[in-house]
């Protein structure tokens, strides 16, 4: 579930990068009241969150999309029966006259927690997406990745694949923002 993926603190959780890229918040209820917390502030490490004892997420809140906004989440998995991402990337873009005016990029399964990749997003700002920009973006995502090696993939493999997946996600988000499906 959306909330289950968030609350287990896994860096490979599929829904978390997309929620963060979209600017989602959650409503958290505790004995001291209700608070609205950004999804990106919940995960703090593998299997760890900043939720306290007795705090319960009661709602996921997604902001309204703008007309020229698009997003995408892509992941790589080794086979369908092992449904845990080796790498994942979510991209949210807003356009003004085809030029990227805002960007948020979130990498999953390539570090101890889901990571907001601000330097990768910054290389997209003020640009129309083309192969040159996509190449720079892909390289930046690979550079920012800090994966481990495990049975699902080596560190080197994950660094390479996150660049490919990020490039595809950026293209898909850009096309969506342009109104293309």
Task: Please provide the spans of the model-predicted regions.
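C-terminal structural segment of proteins
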Residues: 1-181
């Amino acid at each position: 579930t959306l909330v289950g993926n968030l609350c287990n603190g896994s860096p490979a959780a599929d829904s978390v990068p997309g929620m963060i890229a979209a600017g989602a918040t959650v409503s958290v209820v505790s004995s001291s009241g209700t608070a609205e917390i950004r999804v990106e502030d919940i995960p703090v490490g593998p299997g760890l969150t900043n939720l306290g004892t007795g705090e319960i997420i009661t709602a996921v809140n997604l902001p309204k999309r703008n007309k020229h906004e698009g997003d995408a989440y892509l992941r790589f998995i080794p086979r369908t029966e092992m449904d845990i991402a080796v790498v994942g990337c979510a991209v949210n873009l807003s356009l003004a006259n085809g030029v990227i005016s805002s960007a948020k990029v979130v990498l999953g399964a390539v570090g101890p927690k889901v990571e907001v990749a601000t330097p990768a997003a910054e290389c997209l700002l003020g640009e129309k997406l083309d192969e040159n920009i996509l190449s720079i973006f892909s390289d930046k995502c690979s550079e920012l990745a800090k994966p481990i090696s495990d049975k699902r993939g080596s560190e080197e493999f994950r660094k390479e694949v996150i660049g490919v997946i990020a490039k595809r996600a950026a293209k898909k988000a850009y096309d969506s923002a342009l109104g293309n499906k």
